C-alpha cells in the first residue's frame, strides 16, 4: 500500500529496522522532536545508512537506510558515471574485439546495458524491500517529451533513425529513454548530501582520466619545438624531434593535430564533457574541508581547465564563460570558506590557462592559434562561422516545412541536402554533408518539432530556476552543500550554452540528466511502498524483458566489429574482396538499422559484380541480381539518405559503362536509363547535392543527352569551383562534343 511521506525528518523502513536503529542510538544522538518553523527547516538527524547525513535545508531528503539491492543500484549508477566518459575501444591490436567506431558506439553500449541494470535493480529493490518512490510534477513533462518524441518517431522520414539515432551520434528516442531512466533513478537514490558528494567525486575522478589523456595528446605541440631547439643548439642535432605521448595508434585525424580529443574522438565532443569536469570539480574544491582532498581537487581542476583550452573548441569557451559568471555570482552570495592554499591554486588555474594560450600564439593555424580562434567567434562572414549560419538557415527551412512533429530525432543529415543553400558547397565543399545543426535548439525543433523543443527547454528551466534560488540564499551551517550545488548548477548552464553551438551525444548528455536529477531532489516528495509477496516472479519477468534490448545492444556492438573487419581486409585481391563482403553482410545481418553498413555491402558487391561482368564470368547474372537486391534494401531502409542514392548510382552507371565498353548497347542503355530515371527526382529534391548531380550527368551522357549533361556539369562547377571531378568530366565531354562536331563537318567533304 502506498503512503505519502508526511514529514521531512521521518524515517521509513520496516518496524524491525527502525527499532534496531533506535536501540543503537545513544541518548546524545537521539533526534529531537521536530519543530515547525516558518522557513520549514528541521533539525539535523543521523542514520546508520550510507550517506546518512541529512541536509534538511535543501529539501525533503531521504533518511531511509538503503537495502543491499539499493546499495547495488546506487553504486551501479556511480559506476556508470565513472565508466561512460572513459569508455572507448582500446583493443586496436586485437582483431577479435576491435570496432570501427572506437568512441560513441562503445559509450552508447555501456549506457544501454547500464541503464537496464539500473532500472531492473531499482524495481527489485522496491518490490522486495518496499520504500520510497520520490516524485515531482516534472515527471509529467518528461513523460510528455517522450510521448511526443514517440509520435515524431512514428511519423518520421526514417523511424529507425529517429529511434536508434544516426551512426556515431545516437541521439534518437532510445537515448532519451535512457536519460529518463537515469533521471528517475538518480532522484530515488542520490538523496543525501554524502551521496551527492560521492556522485560529484566519482565524476571528478573520471574527468581526471579523460582530461589527462587529452593533455598527453596536446603536450607534443610544445615539447617537440622545445626539444628540437635544444637538440639543435646544444647537441648539434639536425633532425627534428617528434614525440608522441599518445600510445594508441590513431591514423589520420579529421581535425588539426595536437588538439585534445581524449576518449571522445573529437575535440568538440570532448568539450561538452569538460563542462561537467570543470564545474563539478570546482564545487568539490570549495566544499572540501580536508586539506589533502582539496589539493587533489585543485589539481584535477587545473588539468580540466587546461584541456578546455587545448581542445580548441569555441563552444565550451562560450559555455564555460557563462557558467563561470553564474558560479562567481552565486559564490559571492555564499561567501565560501577560503584556505591559504586556494589562492595559489586559483592563480595556478589562471596561469595554466594563460600559458597554454600563449604557447599557441606562434602557430600559423587559425584553429590552433588561441587568439585567432577566439577572434573567429566574432567573424560571421568567413570560416566555420559562415558554414554554421548556412546550416542554421537550412535548419530553419526544415522547421518551417514540418513545424509540429519535425522530421524525426537525429534525422537532420537525411534532410539537410533538401534545404542546404547553394553557397554551402562553396564554403564547405561539395562532399560535406551536415549531419548536425550545431545548435541544439534548432536541432531539436527540426527533429521533434517546435513543441518537443519547448518541452525539452521547459524541463531545463524547471530545474535551473529553483536551483538558482536555492543557491542564492546564503547559509553558513550548510555551506559545503551549497558549493556542490553551485558547481552542479554551473555545469548544467555551461553545457546547455555549449549545446547552442555544439552537438549533443549520449556520452556527455547522460550527465546532464543525472545532474538535473540531483538538482531537483530537494523539491521532490515521497510515497512509501510496502514490499510485495510476488517479488520473485515479477523480478524474473523484469529480467527477461530487459534481456531483449540488452541482446540487441550486444548484437549492434558485434555488427560494428564486422563493419571494421570489412574495411580492414580491403579489396586488393579476389579473396580479400570476398572476405570483406562476408564481413559486411554479417554487419548488416546483426544490425539492419544502419545505412552505412548496407552501403558498404553495396559498394563491395558493385566492385565484385563489375569485375565479373568485365570478365564475362558465369556468376555475373547472379551477382547483378544480388547487388540490385542489396540496393533495394538500402534505399528502403532510408529513402531520404543522400549517400544511398550515390552508392546506387555508382553501380548503375558503372554497369552502363562496363556494358558500353563490351559493345552491349542494349544493356548499357538499360542501366543508363535506370540511373537517369531514379536520380532525376532526387536531383529535384536535393538540387545542391553536387556529387549526385555528377552521377546524373554521367547517366545523361550515356543516354546521348550531351547538352543536358553539360548543363548539369556546369551547375556542379559553379556550385563548387574546387570540384575537380566535375571539371574534368566537363572538359572531357566538351572535347568529345568537339570531336563529334568536327567529324560531322568533315563527313560531306569525304563523300564528294
List each language-model region with its residue ranges.
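Flexible interhelical linker loops that connect adjacent transmembrane helices
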Residues: 522-536
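Alpha-helical transmembrane segments of multi-pass inner-membrane proteins
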Residues: 2-3, 8-35, 44-46, 50-90, ...
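C-terminal luminal/periplasmic domains and tails of membrane-associated envelope-modifying transferases
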Residues: 2-6, 564-752
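Hydrophobic alpha-helical transmembrane segments in integral membrane proteins
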Residues: 360-369, 534-575, 596-600
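Interfacial juxtamembrane loops and adjacent helix segments
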Residues: 221-263, 368-389, 393-401, 409-446, ...
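Short, hydrophobic transmembrane alpha-helix segments
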Residues: 88-106, 126-132, 289
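Non-cytosolic membrane-interface motifs at loop->transmembrane helix junctions
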Residues: 101-102, 163-173
Amino acid at each position: 500500500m502506498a503512503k505519502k511521506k508526511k514529514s521531512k525528518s521521518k524515517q521509513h523502513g520496516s518496524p524491525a529496522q527502525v527499532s534496531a536503529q533506535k536501540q543503537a542510538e545513544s541518548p546524545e544522538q537521539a533526534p529531537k522532536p521536530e519543530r515547525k518553523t516558518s522557513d520549514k527547516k528541521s533539525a539535523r538527524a543521523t542514520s546508520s545508512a550510507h550517506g546518512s547525513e541529512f541536509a534538511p535545508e535543501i529539501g525533503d531528503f531521504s533518511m531511509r537506510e538503503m537495502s543491499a539491492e539499493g546499495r547495488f543500484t546506487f553504486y551501479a549508477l556511480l559506476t556508470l558515471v565513472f565508466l561512460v566518459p572513459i569508455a572507448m575501444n582500446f583493443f586496436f591490436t586485437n582483431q577479435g574485439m576491435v570496432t570501427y567506431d572506437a568512441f560513441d558506439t562503445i559509450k552508447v553500449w555501456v549506457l544501454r546495458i547500464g541503464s537496464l541494470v539500473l532500472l531492473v535493480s531499482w524495481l527489485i529493490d522496491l518490490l522486495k524491500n518496499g520504500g520510497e518512490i520520490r516524485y515531482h510534477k516534472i515527471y509529467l513533462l518528461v513523460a510528455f517529451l517522450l510521448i511526443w518524441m514517440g509520435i515524431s518517431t512514428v511519423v518520421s522520414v526514417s523511424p529507425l533513425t529517429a529511434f536508434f539515432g544516426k551512426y556515431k551520434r545516437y541521439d534518437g528516442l532510445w537515448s532519451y529513454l535512457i536519460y529518463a531512466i537515469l533521471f528517475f533513478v538518480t532522484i530515488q537514490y542520490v538523496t543525501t548530501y554524502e551521496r551527492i558528494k560521492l556522485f560529484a567525486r566519482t565524476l571528478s575522478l573520471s574527468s581526471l582520466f579523460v582530461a589527462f589523456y587529452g593533455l598527453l595528446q596536446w603536450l607534443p605541440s610544445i615539447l617537440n619545438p622545445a626539444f628540437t631547439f635544444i637538440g639543435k643548439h646544444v647537441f648539434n642535432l639536425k633532425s627534428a624531434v617528434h614525440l608522441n605521448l599518445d600510445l594508441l595508434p590513431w591514423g589520420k585525424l579529421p581535425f588539426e593535430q595536437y588538439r585534445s580529443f581524449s576518449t571522445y574522438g573529437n575535440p568538440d565532443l570532448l568539450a561538452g564533457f569538460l563542462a561537467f569536469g570543470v564545474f563539478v570539480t570546482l564545487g568539490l574544491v570549495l566544499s572540501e574541508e580536508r586539506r589533502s582532498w582539496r589539493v587533489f581537487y585543485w589539481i584535477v581542476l587545473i588539468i580540466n581547465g587546461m584541456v578546455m583550452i587545448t581542445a580548441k573548441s569555441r563552444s565550451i569557451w562560450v559555455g564555460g564563460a557563462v557558467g563561470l559568471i553564474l558560479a562567481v555570482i552565486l559564490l559571492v552570495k555564499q561567501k565560501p570558506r577560503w584556505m591559504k592554499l586556494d589562492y595559489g591554486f586559483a592563480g595556478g588555474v589562471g596561469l595554466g590557462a594563460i600559458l597554454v594560450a600563449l604557447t599557441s600564439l606562434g602557430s600559423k593555424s587559425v584553429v590552433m592559434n588561441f587568439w585567432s580562434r577566439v577572434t573567429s567567434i566574432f567573424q560571421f562572414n568567413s570560416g566555420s562561422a559562415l558554414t554554421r549560419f548556412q546550416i542554421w538557415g537550412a535548419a530553419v527551412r526544415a522547421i518551417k516545412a514540418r513545424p509540429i512533429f519535425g522530421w524525426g530525432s537525429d534525422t537532420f543529415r537525411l534532410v539537410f541536402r533538401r534545404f542546404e543553400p547553394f553557397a554551402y558547397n562553396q564554403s564547405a565543399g561539395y562532399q560535406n554533408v551536415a549531419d548536425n545543426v550545431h545548435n541544439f535548439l534548432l536541432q531539436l525543433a527540426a527533429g521533434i518539432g517546435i513543441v518537443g523543443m519547448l518541452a525539452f527547454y521547459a524541463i531545463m528551466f524547471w530545474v535551473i530556476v529553483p536551483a538558482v534560488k536555492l543557491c542564492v540564499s546564503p547559509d553558513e551551517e550548510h555551506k559545503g552543500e551549497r558549493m556542490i550545488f553551485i558547481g552542479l548548477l554551473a555545469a548544467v548552464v555551461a553545457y546547455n550554452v555549449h549545446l547552442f553551438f555544439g552537438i549533443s551525444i549520449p556520452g556527455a548528455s547522460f550527465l546532464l540528466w543525472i545532474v538535473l536529477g540531483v538538482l531537483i531532489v530537494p523539491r521532490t516528495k515521497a510515497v512509501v511502498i510496502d514490499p510485495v509477496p510476488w517479488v520473485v516472479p515479477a523480478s524474473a519477468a523484469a529480467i527477461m524483458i530487459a534481456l531483449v534490448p540488452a541482446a540487441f545492444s550486444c548484437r549492434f556492438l558485434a555488427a560494428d566489429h564486422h563493419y571494421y573487419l570489412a574495411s580492414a581486409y580491403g579489396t586488393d585481391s579476389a579473396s580479400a574482396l570476398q572476405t570483406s563482403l562476408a564481413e559486411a553482410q554479417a554487419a548488416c545481418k546483426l544490425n539492419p538499422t544502419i545505412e552505412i553498413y548496407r552501403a558498404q555491402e553495396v559498394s563491395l558487391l558493385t566492385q565484385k559484380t563489375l569485375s565479373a561482368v568485365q570478365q564475362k564470368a558465369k556468376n555475373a547474372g547472379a551477382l547483378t541480381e544480388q547487388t540490385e537486391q542489396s540496393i533495394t534494401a538500402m534505399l528502403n531502409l532510408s529513402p531520404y539518405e543522400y549517400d544511398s542514392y550515390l552508392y546506387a548510382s555508382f553501380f548503375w552507371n558503372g554497369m552502363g559503362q562496363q556494358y558500353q565498353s563490351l559493345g552491349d548497347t542494349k544493356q548499357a542503355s538499360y542501366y543508363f536509363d535506370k540511373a537517369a530515371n531514379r536520380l532525376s527526382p532526387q536531383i529535384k529534391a536535393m538540387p545542391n547535392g553536387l556529387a549526385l548531380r555528377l552521377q546524373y550527368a554521367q547517366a545523361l551522357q550515356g543516354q546521348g543527352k550531351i547538352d543536358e549533361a553539360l548543363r548539369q556539369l556546369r551547375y556542379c562547377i559553379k556550385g563548387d569551383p574546387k570540384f575537380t571531378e566535375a571539371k574534368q568530366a566537363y572538359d572531357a565531354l566538351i572535347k568529345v562534343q568537339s570531336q563529334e562536331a568536327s567529324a560531322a563537318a568533315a563527313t560531306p567533304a569525304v563523300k564528294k
